[in-house]
Amino acid sequence: MIKERVKMEVIGLEIPLISGNEEYTLAELISKYPLEENDIIVIAETVVSKSEKNVILKDTIKPSNEAIELSKKLGKEPEVVQVILDESNETVRLGPNFIVTETKHGFVCANSGVDESNTSKGIKPLPKNPDKSANEIRKGIEEITGKKVGVIINDSMGRPFRKGSCGVAIGVSGVCGLWDRKGEKDLFGRELKTTEVGIADELAATASVVMGQSDEGIPLVIIRNAPVPFKEGTGKELIRKKEEDVFR
């Protein structure tokens, strides 16, 4: 016998292009949609960075000698390489046309998350403090709507040992980031000893299927009826400590 157990809804929303000069906040914009209790709102990091005016014009960047030399190896503009270096704590690896860095947030990713996609001009770093941004957006939405919600800021990142980019959570508020299930029982009554679920990453990846990574124009996704814990989480709790990382 087959029976339904869980039905989760994923709703992609088109919004006006964000420039950073709007007379409304992201919370005010998102609240115009009829949200429901325990909706999870996933927002593309591009929208958050642009709304926070975190875009750097190329003519304001003075590349260092290091950036100029690296740009020759990578086939990238020196200005772009300079921003990548500025946004990083350290360089982890050099690829053929990318740099794997640890960002100032602690993320290990290509090019410090810096890109020029879906930005009409300038270079766009990641939001300065994604958890803080997610929290401010969530609190704004809850104040306006009276509904309890979760907010995730997502970005697409490549993965070591697997091809293809995938959505990940870089900022989290109002929903669990890392779901610790140790001590629970499996179907046969055995106690789970090590299970920790990167639930915010799973939600971010789910939203990315609808958002797309090209010209879809869907930077906002509502996930409804998600079977996840609604407790205060962060994106930082998903970052593996350097001393626990066996691949670095």
Curated annotation (Swiss-Prot):
A divalent metal cation 2 binds at S156, Q213. Catalyzes the GTP-dependent successive addition of two or more gamma-linked L-glutamates to the L-lactyl phosphodiester of 7,8-didemethyl-8-hydroxy-5-deazariboflavin (F420-0) to form coenzyme F420-0-glutamyl-glutamate (F420-2) or polyglutamated F420 derivatives. It comes from the Archaea. Pathway: Cofactor biosynthesis; coenzyme F420 biosynthesis. The keyword Metal-binding applies. Pfam families: F420_ligase (PF01996). One of its GO terms (biological process) is F420-0 metabolic process. A divalent metal cation 1 binds at D115, D155. Keywords: GTP-binding, Ligase, Magnesium, Manganese, Metal-binding, Nucleotide-binding, Potassium. It is an enzyme of class 6 (ligase). Binds 2 divalent metal cations per subunit. The ions could be magnesium and/or manganese. It catalyses: oxidized coenzyme F420-0 + GTP + L-glutamate = oxidized coenzyme F420-1 + GDP + phosphate + H(+); oxidized coenzyme F420-1 + GTP + L-glutamate = oxidized coenzyme F420-2 + GDP + phosphate + H(+). GO terms for molecular function: coenzyme F420-0:L-glutamate ligase activity; coenzyme F420-1:gamma-L-glutamate ligase activity; GTP binding; metal ion binding. The keyword Cell membrane does not apply. Homodimer. Its cofactor is Mg(2+); Mn(2+); K(+). Signal peptide: none annotated. Its EC number is 6.3.2.31, 6.3.2.34. GTP binds at residues 15-18, 45-46, 50, 118, 211-218. This is Coenzyme F420:L-glutamate ligase.
